[in-house]
Amino acid sequence: MENPEIARIFEEVADVLEIQNENPFRIRAYRNAVRTVESLTTPLRKWVEENRPLTDLQGIGKEMANHIKEMVETGTLGFRDELLAEVPRSLIELMRLPGLGPKKARKVYDELKIGSVDELEAAARDGRIASLPGFGAKSQEKILAGIQEYRQHGSRFLLPQAERMVEPLLGYLRESPGLERLEVAGSYRRRKETIGDIDLLAIASQPLPVMERFRAYPQVDKILNAGDTKSTIVLGSGLQVDLRVVPAEGYGAALIYFTGSKEHNVKLRRRAVERGLRISEYGVFNEHDGDNECIAGREEADVYATVRLSWIPPEMREGRGEIEAAAKGPLPELIRVEDLRGDLHMHSTWSDGRNSIEEMVTACAARGYEYMVISDHSKSLAMTGGLDAYRLRLQWAEIDQVRARHPEIRILRAMEVDILGDGSLDLEDEMLAGLDLVLVSLHSRFDLPADQQTERVLKALSHPEVNIFCHPTARLINRRKPVEMDLDLILRRAAELGVAVELNSSPNRLDLKDTHLKLARELGCKVVIDTDAHRIGELDLMRYGVEQARRAGLTAGDVMNTLPFEKFWAAMQR
């Protein structure tokens, strides 16, 4: 059993325990185990095979270690099976719907005998949900919207989940005899925040052995198509993968075609037609040439050059102005991970982080950062161990001590301060003034009407001590919708006030999304890219934020934490 399946089973256990109203700390332990497993780069089966102590992993105690060993050795988890026998499986699916959750899922199941998404939709449409105590018409509308979102995105994988399935497959395929080139195309290559399926393109002197090896991959659950140059498999995780072996002379054209997006390809082909050319997945052809000779196609840049375009990075290929920009000349170089000089949002053991301040500082210095920010939660988030004024002063004293031991990196003291329901901040003004940076976030009251939510955020941003608005829409991809608010107005006001907006690199957030980032840049907003790391390993999530920024067309000059410290510090002042 591979890491994605292990993480999925732990997530399932946590869901069932939540339905059963188990101890919140036990539920949290399983969710922490999910995060640990998902952040690993080494397969857990190797840990088990090499008899390495699994308890060395953060968040993995003896019970979790035994569970992992059992899953690796048997392919299942008896404890999970016992739990599932106690709870209708349909309840798990119901609680994953945006706008429902475990308590409401249990209620609709118990009182209306609803056991499927289809039955829930029928009950919502005929008004039975609204009649339940504690629900009402507004809850019913949100459930219907959640069902629609679930059907659109529920079967899609987050980028890291897809990576942990795709990378081992690529390594396996690269051992195929006759394989000359292999790349991933599709939304995976464009680095979309969720992935539905995977497209692989290859060049091979002998296509058949590559296809046979592909279909023999140990993680295959089903074979949907078995051809000489194209095959389709479904992995045990449910991820569908297509592999095509194409001729070398048309590889670049095929890579463009299967990378997409559809909108990008339509505009590209239209531009070709205007020039008497035809672009397909096989190459570029002269429409007036009776011989139907391919005039370009081996490399992507050759295809773009035939229609007088500079090469367009895959992340930008969404049909949102990138072709028009490339027609004017080479596109600006997009931001890279190595451009970033600091991480401005992370947590320590003072709240819900897994590492001490010193450990986080050492890890940031090892990554070559010039500066970093410690930003633990404020007191209203009781489950995270948020800090009140007294504990915050104690933390400042520790930061001063760590600063003295680490002159190689600037350590800024900050806090991720909750925006309360009325828009006030969860920390006294005197303490806010003592922070180097003030980060503010929404962690509650996600269901406020859009106008009230907008007023709430605007009030918080208007506080003179606020510097950064973190994960602005509070979304959790595939799990929680963005809060309803006038984001355009909020971004405009943030630009006027000099408040930066965060691109949170956590793959289950990636908040702001690419289109909002593009708008933020157009409005003159300051933008920062942070990890929101809760453990050392999560500092490496920065690359997902950078990929999202690249999708928005951002350069290093568009992001504040690419600046040297003195310039960064000046830029962050209001």
Regions found by a protein language model. Name each.
Residues 1-22:
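Charged, compositionally biased N-terminal leader segments and the immediate start
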Residues 14, 24-231, 238, 243, ...:
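Accessory alpha-helical DNA-binding modules that contact the DNA backbone or grooves
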Residues 14-21, 151-155, 442, 446, ...:
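Short amphipathic alpha-helical interaction patches enriched in hydrophobic/aromatic residues
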Residues 159, 349-350:
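Short acidic-aromatic active-site loops that bind/stabilize oxyanions
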Residues 183-186, 413-415, 505:
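Short loop/edge segments at beta-strand edges and connector loops
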Residues 184, 342-346, 416:
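Two-metal-ion RNase H-like nuclease active-site motif
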Residues 191-277, 281, 285-348, 354-374, ...:
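Charged catalytic cores and adjacent phosphate/nucleic-acid-binding surfaces used
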